[in-house]
């Protein structure tokens, strides 16, 4: 650990704010908990990796002290709460041009990847996210051939796509090479996805990459992006979804990470509403991931004009794909029953989004 302060307080250095691009707080904040970000300076609105007395927690230190004690602010994505993990050892900490990257060994969830103070994955429960975000769309269409991953620098989504033998090309556009390098070193079970010869890696901005892509190139696009804070807000706005739709074939599918139903109902509504203006059909599914805020994460699934897509009933079931169940490693979370169950929404969320999801 670094930087002992006072009574066993150990804090990592704060970021320099490069990822904000100077524009993060000037964008319109969606009508959800992100409003909390607007009341603190830009550098402080970013989350920083903090280890206090051997525990990692998502609140982060603001510069300076108050009354002799470090001042902590809630993460703007989920004000008023944070998940903590006991840290056995910090394995890596550095700043890329875009974000702070932290890897530590936890007491209960194995190794943990943290970006700008937000847990991205743990060895124990990554399967509940990686498997669902990949197979929900790919098992909903017949024989996908060209697939694009936006983000996904840890390689987990690539690992899951590689189970599908029909896929011929897997493009991945990741802006931060450090995430890829760190994953290859500390998370080889995920980064094995990069070893697939079908993978074509592109380092750069996804929006720019999509603008240069031929129209109708992809059967499926999977957006494994960071939370919509600062520059990433553009990834939940209409122009980006229009760019995604343009890159899909008729009947092509999109699966986009879509936050927590317990914390971001308004943001989910905003995303579904925007997608309804752009795509033929829109659905919402979810998965249980213990180390994500509130323990759940959602996905918006969309299809373009063309052959109808029945997302709720997999027509390309993973169980019938040759070797898919054990390719690279055995599936731990996803199966066809979990696929169908993922679209069952609790009553409170169904009330909120029913009119938006209606055909």
UniProtKB/Swiss-Prot annotation:
Origin species: Arabidopsis thaliana
Classification via InterPro entries: PABS, PABS_CS, SAM-dependent_MTases_sf, Spermi_synthase, Spermi_synthase_euk, Spermidine_synt_N, Spermidine_synt_N_sf
Catalytic class of the enzyme: transferase
Lineage of producing organism: Eukaryota, Viridiplantae, Streptophyta, Embryophyta, Tracheophyta
Catalytic activity: S-adenosyl 3-(methylsulfanyl)propylamine + spermidine = spermine + S-methyl-5'-thioadenosine + H(+)
Signal sequence extent: none
Pfam families per UniProt: Spermine_synt_N, Spermine_synth
GO biological process: spermine biosynthetic process
Protein name as catalogued: Spermine synthase
Residues binding spermidine: 129, 154
């Amino acid at each position: 650990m670094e930087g002992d302060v006072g009574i066993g307080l150990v804090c990592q250095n704060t970021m320099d704010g490069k990822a904000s691009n100077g524009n993060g707080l000037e964008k319109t904040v969606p009508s959800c908990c992100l409003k909390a970000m607007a009341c603190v300076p830009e550098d402080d609105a970013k989350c920083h990796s903090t280890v206090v007395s051997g525990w990692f927690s998502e609140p982060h230190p603001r510069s300076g002290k108050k009354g002799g004690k470090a001042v902590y602010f809630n993460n703007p994505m989920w004000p008023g709460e944070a998940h903590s993990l006991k840290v056995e050892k910090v394995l890596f900490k550095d700043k890329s041009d875009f974000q702070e990257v932290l890897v530590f060994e936890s007491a209960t969830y194995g190794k943990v990847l943290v970006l700008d103070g937000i847990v991205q994955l743990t060895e124990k429960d990554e399967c509940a996210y990686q498997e669902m975000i990949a197979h929900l769309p790919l098992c909903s269409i017949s024989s996908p051939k060209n697939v694009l991953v936006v983000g996904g620098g840890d390689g987990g989504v690539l690992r899951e796509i590689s189970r599908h033998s029909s896929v011929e090309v897997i493009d991945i556009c990741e802006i931060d090479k450090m995430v890829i390098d760190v994953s290859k070193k500390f998370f080889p079970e995920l980064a094995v996805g990069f070893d697939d010869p079908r993978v074509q890696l592109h380092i750069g901005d996804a929006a720019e990459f999509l603008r240069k892509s031929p129209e109708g190139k992809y059967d499926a696009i999977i957006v494994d992006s960071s939370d919509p804070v600062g520059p990433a807000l553009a990834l939940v706005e209409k122009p980006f979804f229009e760019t995604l739709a343009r890159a899909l074939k008729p009947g092509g599918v999109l699966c986009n990470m879509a936050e927590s139903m317990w914390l971001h109902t308004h943001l989910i509504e905003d995303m579904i509403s925007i997608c309804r203006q752009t795509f033929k059909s829109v659905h919402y599914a979810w998965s249980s991931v213990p180390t994500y805020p509130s323990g759940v994460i959602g996905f918006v699934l969309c299809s373009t004009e063309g052959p109808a897509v029945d997302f709720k009933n997999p027509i390309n079931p993973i169980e019938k794909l040759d070797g898919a169940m054990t390719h690279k490693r055995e599936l731990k979370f996803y199966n066809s029953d979990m696929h169908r169950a993922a679209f069952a929404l609790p009553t409170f969320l169904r009330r909120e989004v029913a009119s938006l999801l209606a055909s």
